[in-house]
């Protein structure tokens, strides 16, 4: 929450950042997960802080080495596998690509970041393999690869894709109720134009969106879509998108 406040306060003002932090701290899902001793909240914190650090690195033109970001990525990798490292890199890479950075430069830069963030986890995995042997290796394969492919040897939190929508809506109580009530008091405009026109306006809107809002939107969309792919779905898997949803909710409430 403090990292999110600092990130948005520098770029969007203290009022919006404070409200964003308050919403993040007080929604049902974050509060519930934060009071339980589980790895999911730690994973979310490390992934979100890695996203903030990689964004700052992008602001600097990918110059230098984002050591703090690499440490966060390494910690996320150790917490719950390579997905903790891959998703922040994916979000930031897509953001920079949309903003016109050359694909080759993005690829090489994030390849280096990815390899650097694998050093500490590799040391731990080697040590764990020396103790656990083939049984440990099979567990890693099942949890990190077969879970995504839906080929685990046992059923684990299998739910349909719409389950994620339900958990986010429920998890953001009481703010989802506030948003739903506010819909009755908004002024609506008549919908007009063809579907192609809507698509063109949407593309223009995305291109003209300021950097912070676009980065926050991509963090929500890409992480959410990724966690809709595997059969295994839990509400805590989506915790990394909650600070970014809080940013848009804060904008909406101030509006």
Predicted feature locations:
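Membrane-integral, polyisoprenol-dependent glycosyltransferases
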Residues: 1-254
């Amino acid at each position: 929450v403090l990292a999110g406040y600092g990130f948005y306060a520098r770029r969007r003002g203290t009022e919006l950042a404070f409200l964003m932090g308050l919403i993040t701290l007080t929604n049902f899902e974050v509060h519930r997960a934060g009071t339980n001793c589980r790895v999911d909240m730690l994973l979310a914190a490390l992934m979100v802080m890695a996203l903030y650090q990689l964004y700052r690195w992008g602001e600097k033109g990918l110059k230098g080495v984002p050591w703090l970001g690499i440490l966060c990525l390494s910690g996320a990798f150790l917490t719950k596998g390579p997905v903790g490292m891959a998703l922040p890199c994916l979000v930031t890479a897509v953001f920079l690509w949309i903003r016109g950075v050359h694909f080759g430069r993005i690829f090489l830069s994030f390849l280096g970041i990815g390899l650097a963030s694998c050093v500490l986890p590799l040391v731990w995995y080697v040590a764990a393999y020396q103790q656990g042997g083939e049984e440990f290796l099979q567990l890693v394969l099942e949890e990190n690869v077969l879970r995504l492919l839906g080929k685990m040897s046992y059923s684990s939190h299998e739910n349909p894709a719409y389950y994620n929508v339900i958990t986010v809506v429920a998890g953001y109580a009481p703010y989802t109720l506030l948003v739903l009530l506010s819909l009755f008091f908004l002024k609506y405009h008549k919908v007009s134009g063809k579907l192609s026109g809507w698509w063109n306006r949407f593309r223009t809107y995305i291109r003209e969106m300021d950097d912070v809002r676009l980065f926050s939107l991509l963090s929500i969309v890409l992480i959410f879509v990724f966690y809709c792919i595997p059969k295994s779905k839990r509400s805590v898997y989506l915790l990394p998108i909650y600070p970014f949803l809080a940013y848009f909710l804060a904008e909406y409430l101030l509006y």
